[in-house]
Amino acid sequence: METEAIDGYITCDNELSPEREHSNMAIDLTSSTPNGQHASPSHMTSTNSVKLEMQSDEECDRKPLSREDEIRGHDEGSSLEEPLIESSEVADNRKVQELQGEGGIRLPNGKLKCDVCGMVCIGPNVLMVHKRSHTGERPFHCNQCGASFTQKGNLLRHIKLHSGEKPFKCPFCSYACRRRDALTGHLRTHSVGKPHKCNYCGRSYKQRSSLEEHKERCHNYLQNVSMEAAGQVMSHHVPPMEDCKEQEPIMDNNISLVPFERPAVIEKLTGNMGKRKSSTPQKFVGEKLMRFSYPDIHFDMNLTYEKEAELMQSHMMDQAINNAITYLGAEALHPLMQHPPSTIAEVAPVISSAYSQVYHPNRIERPISRETADSHENNMDGPISLIRPKSRPQEREASPSNSCLDSTDSESSHDDHQSYQGHPALNPKRKQSPAYMKEDVKALDTTKAPKGSLKDIYKVFNGEGEQIRAFKCEHCRVLFLDHVMYTIHMGCHGYRDPLECNICGYRSQDRYEFSSHIVRGEHTFH
């Protein structure tokens, strides 16, 4: 009771007079004794004085404040609040300035943005490390080799290289490594299951990288991607087919690609042993799809067909080589392993042996060159003559192609095409005898050798001035540096007529038209 009175007194009057201080001290000292009894006779007097003081304090508290005191108190309160608000704004501005000084901008979501490249970082430490990539600062250096790093963790990992420490060890084998992620990848090799599975062939792998490598070799996956790409191309590109109605009346107006079927003109050649095989090289698009005439059908090959096109081209090349070997004979490839013959007389036995394997008595003759070939249009059943009368030195002409060299001769006439059908037939009995072959070779040697050898007529030199071998097509007057290309080219000439395409049966008027037909691939089947 007395203590509360003293507190109230102190709050009401900020300053105490000496008399009141003395009275209070007297009250504290004489108020009570250790046994709880009042020892001073003046206790009642002091108690009354304390009560009076308490009443005076209560009256002082109950007095209403004046208008000036309220205004003064309001001003004091506002003056206390304003410094707090100002201090928070200053702190925020200071943080922004610090972040901008570090090269970062505070975003609304609390993250920091690099002012150089715009990279968003989650904190100031990450931003500080990132800024080192722009400034080139590397504060962490290796004491042994001098290597520097932007982060301390990279330095600690580097130090393990010098010490040879490998703290991460496999619990299943003796494998140990310096990095935790390397151990995590190694532990997958011990797992029983293979979580990464190919949806196209069913094979499973433990690592995703192995699955990605497998997809590059998976045929089902590549085929599916190719079919999807082809479907998209065909859905966006529907070629007009009005021009194809004249040549292909069977085709639908909305179909630009049809499954490949063997043409009837080639199907008829399968029963004849001496003629070329029916599997002639064609222009394929995709798998078992054939493209018809170039001017009539428009088709944009997608890039996904690249691998399949390469495989198909190699398959077509094998077919062409096989057809040419059947056409010329297996011994026609011998010049690849032998030195080129010096004279035409030495070439004749090779050609004779090659054509003796494919000749048939019921065929018309096959002209080989202007000195060694002749035909007859009336006698279709006579055997073939390998030697041509020298009085009729005619040969076919053709324009240069992309795969061979062109000669300087540019003569061409329609009479050359008729010269193969205007000579009388020779004696069939004499042609079939072996003695006749030898006599023809000798006649060719005596008539052609004085004019000079083949090397004297055609000489081909490389960039270094060295003479190289060349193979000439007598029908097209074209030189080939590669014997395989020469063999393939010879397989394109027709069996009955050199100017007849052996793929589609098209008959050309001269060698220029024949070469253009072969190069453009305008093979149309009716």
Swiss-Prot record:
Its main location: nucleus. The modification N6-acetyllysine is found at residue 288. PROSITE patterns: ZINC_FINGER_C2H2_1, ZINC_FINGER_C2H2_2. Residues 29-50 have a biased composition (Polar residues). The keyword rRNA processing does not apply. Changing residue 162 to P: Found in patients with autosomal dominant hearing loss; uncertain significance; affects transcriptional regulation as shown in a luciferase reporter assay. It is found in: Nucleus. The keyword Repressor does not apply. Keywords: Acetylation, Activator, DNA-binding, Hearing, Isopeptide bond, Metal-binding, Nucleus, Phosphoprotein, Repeat, Transcription, Transcription regulation, Ubl conjugation, Zinc, Zinc-finger. InterPro entries: Ikaros_C2H2-ZF, Znf_C2H2_sf, Znf_C2H2_type. The modification Phosphoserine is found at residues 56, 78-79. Changing residue 145 to F: Found in patients with autosomal dominant hearing loss; uncertain significance; affects transcriptional regulation as shown in a luciferase reporter assay. Residues 60-77, 370-379 have a biased composition (Basic and acidic residues). One of its GO terms (molecular function) is zinc ion binding. It comes from the Eukaryota. GO terms for cellular component: nucleus. GO terms for biological process: regulation of transcription by RNA polymerase II. Residues 28-91, 370-435 are annotated as: Disordered. A zinc finger (C2H2-type) spans 112-134, 140-162, 168-190, 196-219, 471-493, 499-523. Gene3D superfamilies: Classic Zinc Finger. There is a cross-link at residues 95, 442, 448 (Glycyl lysine isopeptide (Lys-Gly) (interchain with G-Cter in SUMO2)). Transcriptional regulator required for outer hair cells (OHC) maturation and, consequently, for hearing. Can form homodimers. Interacts with IKZF4 and IKZF5. Belongs to the Ikaros C2H2-type zinc-finger protein family. This is Zinc finger protein Helios. The lineage of its organism: Eukaryota, Metazoa, Chordata, Craniata, Vertebrata. The gene is IKZF2.
